[in-house]
Amino acid sequence: MITRKASLILTILSLLAGNALAESIEDLPGVAAHVARAQEIAGDEFGFIASGLLCGPAEETIARAIRTVPGFLVPDAPGIEPMAFFDNLYYVGMYAWGTFVLDTGEGLILIDSLTNEREVEEILLPGMAELGLDPDDLTHVIVTHAHVDHYGGAAYIKETFDVPIIMSELDWQDLAHDISYPYFVRAGYPEVVQPVRDERDHVVEDGEVLEQGNSRVTFYVTPGHTQGALSMFIEVQDGGETRTVALWGGSALRTEVKELSQMHNSLHRFWEIGRELNAEAVISTHAWLVGNFKQHERGRVDGKNPIVIGAGGFDRIMGIYDECMHAQFARNRAAD
């Protein structure tokens, strides 16, 4: 019979063995070389990306985020001060995740929707009011992918403001298999209301363009993070100039070989399109992950928007993603 003390000792030994294995895998040349290359591409400007969650072991992402990202999987996490990234593109949300509001001059497009009614009522709507944006002007809710922190508030927004929800067909289907849902349940979130799959408001197609007012959003289905993750290029206004901003629809890497391979293929396609479109910025509704908060805090220097990193900056961030994915491929091979 195993005593409770013996059981605890076995558990500790198992954890230590697991940590030792993880550390030994990280030291393997195939892993370390790709992480080092990601850090080389990043330099000082983007070093936080290469040394953060993105390039670490994918199986540890959630646990590390809980430890290091303020408000991650905290049901009553507060909102942060809403901020303008561009003249007509605003971040509203918490630190861990948020939304973008695109003011097209002919209505507002919302990108992602927080997790539930509470976050919409207590964070999104007051944040929009602070920016002088009227939720009655919302025309669309774009859901980048079928995880709770992106779709959770969409059904409530649709019902309250009569706004259609935009998702890819694959992610409308994938709602039933959302791998993030159990994490939110275990963390104590109130019931999450999913968009009704049989009432697909708008099924967006790969390459589809949404033109409205002074803005243009071009969608690409980029499977990997989820089967139907939506990435997009958004035309925004910046001091009288029109700029193209890249939004990669799902950042955290998957451990499964199939999904990771899909994500890698999707990245290279998105990367090439971004080069053709001269993408000059990379944003995320997990804004901390790509450094948007750090950029915004710097403020304008000589009138230059700190979110704008130029075509070279876009290229470097895509290169960091690429090397981090190769590092995860190497981890997977080592663990087999």
Task: Please identify what each model-predicted range represents.
Residues 1-8:
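Bacterial N-terminal signal peptides that target proteins for export
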Residues 27-30, 36, 118-120, 128-209, ...:
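Active-site HxH/HxHxD metal-binding segment of metal-dependent hydrolases
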Residues 78-79, 84-87, 122, 133-137, ...:
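Metallo-beta-lactamase
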Residues 111-113, 138-146, 166-168, 221-224, ...:
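Active-site neighborhood of phospho(di)ester-bond hydrolases with catalytic His/Asp-centered motifs
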